[in-house]
């Protein structure tokens, strides 16, 4: 039996140390035992494909985990050029991470096709959001929700360390639901 796949290009973007690679490993590789003791910054993009079934339709996910450092922004444009779905990551305990996600979103929006689906992912939700003592670094939940609403983003929380599969699956299901709705409208 031959299966026809609908191919979806999914790109993971966000600032350095925002958890893209661990999310990638959980989503694509289904790693249960992740090592969090030693952070190593990614210095190149990673690619894997994953076959899934959603609402009885086969999909092939082409998943790109991009590099988060600002010096690679000019290269990142290539990845979201033909993306169907873009996940934008920030971490809760850093206002700078959220500002970086905003900047990256603007770059992705300019350089992507008009029907791309964007999802903002607040990562490391298990960590204390108020762990930084300086007031300037603490994120305001209202600011995040305002950004989500203003830009019509799908929003979700992710915790790779604690119950990671629930957060990742919930975000992914929201995005796939939106993706299939958009595809139905195009095909009618």
Predicted regions and their residues:
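TRAFAC-class small GTPase G-domain
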Residues: 1-188
């Amino acid at each position: 039996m031959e299966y026809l796949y609908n191919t979806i290009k999914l790109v993971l973007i966000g600032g350095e140390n925002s958890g893209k690679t661990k999310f990638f490993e959980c989503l694509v590789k289904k790693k249960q035992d992740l090592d969090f003791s030693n952070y190593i910054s990614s210095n190149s993009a990673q690619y894997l494909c994953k076959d899934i079934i959603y609402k009885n339709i086969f999909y092939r996910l082409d998943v790109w985990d991009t590099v988060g450092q600002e010096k690679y922004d000019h290269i990142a444009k290539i990845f979201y050029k033909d993306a169907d779905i873009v996940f934008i990551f920030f971490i809760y305990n850093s206002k700078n991470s959220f500002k970086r996600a905003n900047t990256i979103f603007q770059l992705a929006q300019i350089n992507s096709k008009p029907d791309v689906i964007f999802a903002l992912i607040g990562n490391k939700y298990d960590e204390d959001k108020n762990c930084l003592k300086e007031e300037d670094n603490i994120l305001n939940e209202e600011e995040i929700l305002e950004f989500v609403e203003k830009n019509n983003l799908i929003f979700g929380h992710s915790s790779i360390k604690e119950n990671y599969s629930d957060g990742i699956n919930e975000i992914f299901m929201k995005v796939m639901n939106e993706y299939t709705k958009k595809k139905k409208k195009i095909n009618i």
